[in-house]
């Protein structure tokens, strides 16, 4: 109910619903709360449909199993969610390489990707990530590689 009321008041595009999901079996996922410590017993894929139908404008989808591991996104989960809803899905949880960011979009079909550990525990930066994704053919806003000395690909200003 709160999602629909918020969507009606502020507009669907302004409502992002965050879902923390844990894999509990083959292609079975459950919604968790309290930073991934408390099971709700709710089927995550059914909940995603409910959220989308209730007026959510975007979904921030976090795989609890992958979060902090740096082993890559749960691409099966992301793909299942993106295939069942017509709203943007932001993939979160598991990025350890720049390639993982690209995979979240190119394989998972996410509209956007989120990451943290890669930037805290490696020499990668958001600037390098944007440049890498652009080289991979992902259209990004705001990349200004020529200002940061990144010569990953030909630049008209370099």
Predicted segment positions?
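Conserved anion-binding
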Residues: 1-61, 65-66
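C-terminal helical cap(s) of enzyme catalytic domains, especially alpha/beta-barrels
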Residues: 3-10, 102-144
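Charged helix-capping and loop-helix junction motifs
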Residues: 41-45, 71-80
